[in-house]
Design a protein with these regions (language model features):
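The feature captures the conserved acid-bearing segment of alpha/beta-hydrolase catalytic domains
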Residues: 72-156, 161, 204, 250, ...
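Conserved strand-to-loop "acid loop" that flanks and positions the catalytic carboxylate
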Residues: 41, 129-138, 268-269, 302
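N-terminal cap/lid segment of alpha/beta-hydrolase-fold proteins
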Residues: 93-115, 194-201, 208-258, 339-342
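Catalytic histidine neighborhood in serine/cysteine hydrolases
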Residues: 154-184
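Primarily recognizes the serine-hydrolase "nucleophile elbow" in alpha/beta-hydrolase
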Residues: 30-83, 116, 213, 361-362
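Cap/lid segment of the alpha/beta-hydrolase catalytic domain
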Residues: 26, 75-78, 83-93, 180-182, ...
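Short amphipathic alpha-helix adjacent to the substrate-entry channel of hydrolases
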Residues: 278-296
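Short beta-strand element of the alpha/beta-hydrolase
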Residues: 259-271
Length: 362
């Protein structure tokens, strides 16, 4: 589901077919600035982790499902930034946990990055809340990667009381887990949404926001398709790994005059974007039903595949910078060696979407 192997990445140069539909400009709502959070599955978990750590003064919590160890694919880091490798992503981060660095190494890097001003001060992480999940049958991302990520949060001040960690307690494959929608629970296959009689959406939102009203049995709100290209450098979404169109779920209560709502960002994994699955992910992972009855807007940014033809100026190294499975950028593809930081292309794009929704300037 994530980038399977480095050789697979080098061997795939064609993007999946299809184009995004026309979409409107993303609007603004009355958002409680203290109630903005993020979650994700697989590559989306790594990106959720990157967003949370880069902007911990704003994101009050994160949900990490089957992924999420900050800087896991980094080979070296210095005062100029990082040098990541896809081979570390597919090796240590996914299948060879013995090659992972100690949690103290990742935590110290985060402190150094904060000292450089590339991410928010780490003190914000100590005031956060965290949901983490790894399935017992996950054969894509080794559970130790998720455990190591949780350990890093602890070293940076996250209290145990603010953590909900399902550590191989459920026989789930590599997937976002639902009560009844998707393939059988232990499977490691598309669409990577598994029916496990476990309401992961509820657990994520309850961990981050506390007690919830009962989920809606029928959605009251609407889905909004919005233009993501304006958030991409130069308006060119494809070379950045961004799909042209993102999606937003707006509960009816959030469109009532004077109503204040919360905002939760949900990030799909590889092979789960609208480019690949249409509306399957953003309609069927169960988040909207809980959001609807609890005044939570849900932002679903969309990644896309990147192939050599998407780069405007051909270079011999383009083949090393592609993204054949539509993953979020957690190993520095598309020449983005700043992908971990506030000025990383995708981190910045999603951050600007959040700022727009909250009615703030960048």
């Amino acid at each position: 589901m994530l980038l399977r192997t480095l050789s697979l990445a080098l061997g795939l140069g064609l993007a999946l077919g299809g184009t995004a539909s026309a979409a409107d400009r993303l609007g603004s709502y009355r958002i409680d600035p203290a109630q903005i959070s993020v979650s994700g599955i697989s590559s989306g978990a790594f990106m959720a982790n990157q967003l949370h750590i880069a902007h911990s003064a704003t994101f009050m919590g994160a949900g990490l499902v089957a992924g999420g160890l900050y800087g896991c694919a980094v080979m070296t880091a210095d005062e100029k930034g990082v040098r990541p490798l896809a081979s570390i992503a597919t090796g240590a981060c996914m299948s060879a946990p013995a090659l992972l660095q100690p949690a103290t190494t990742y935590a110290e890097r985060i402190r150094r990055f904060a000292a450089q001003g590339w991410i928010d001060p780490v003190e914000g992480l100590g005031r956060s809340r965290l949901y983490a999940f790894t399935g017992k049958a996950d054969r894509v991302v080794n559970p130790e990667t998720v455990r190591r990520g949780v350990e890093v949060y602890g070293l940076l001040g996250l209290p145990t009381a603010a953590l909900s960690f399902s550590d191989e307690a459920i026989d789930a494959g590599h997937a976002w887990v639902t009560q009844a929608y998707g393939v059988p629970c232990p499977d490691n296959r598309a669409p990577y949404i598994n029916a496990c009689e476990y309401d992961q959406a509820r657990m994520v939102l309850q961990t981050l926001y506390g007690p919830l009203q009962d989920r809606a049995t029928r959605l009251s709100g609407r889905f909004v398709a919005f233009d993501q290209t304006e958030f991409a450098p130069g308006g060119q979404a494809a070379p950045s790994g961004l799909w042209d169109t993102g999606h937003l779920y707006v509960p009816a209560a959030c469109e009532t005059e004077g109503a204040t709502c919360r905002l939760h960002v949900v990030l799909h994994g590889c092979k789960q974007s609208a480019q690949e699955l249409g509306d399957t992910f953003y309609r069927h992972v169960g988040v909207n039903e809980w959001a609807d009855s609890n005044r939570i807007l849900v932002l679903y940014p969309q990644a896309r595949t990147v192939n050599v033809n998407d780069f405007p100026t051909p270079r011999l190294t383009d083949i090393f910078n592609i993204n054949p499975e539509g993953c979020w950028n957690w190993w520095g593809y598309a020449y983005d060696t700043r992908y971990l930081f506030k000025d990383g292309v995708q981190v910045k794009a999603i951050w600007q979407m959040v700022q727009r929704l909250a009615g703030r300037s960048d």
